[in-house]
């Protein structure tokens, strides 16, 4: 399970996966509201990860464990 660092740049959210030296813009988040944040996350370029939903929108930057699952 890679550690993904999420950070905001202006109005965009970016994800950095150190193990792959990859940084990409987040284009979709399954849960992105005041009560819950996370779930299936789609990155620019087609990669998808799953982050266990957090209680509310986190303060960025934040490091979270993610799984890469081709079935999501």
Swiss-Prot record:
Gene3D superfamilies: NifT/FixU-like. The keyword Amino-acid biosynthesis does not apply. Pfam families: NifT. One of its GO terms (biological process) is nitrogen fixation. Keywords: Nitrogen fixation. This is Protein NifT. It comes from Klebsiella pneumoniae.
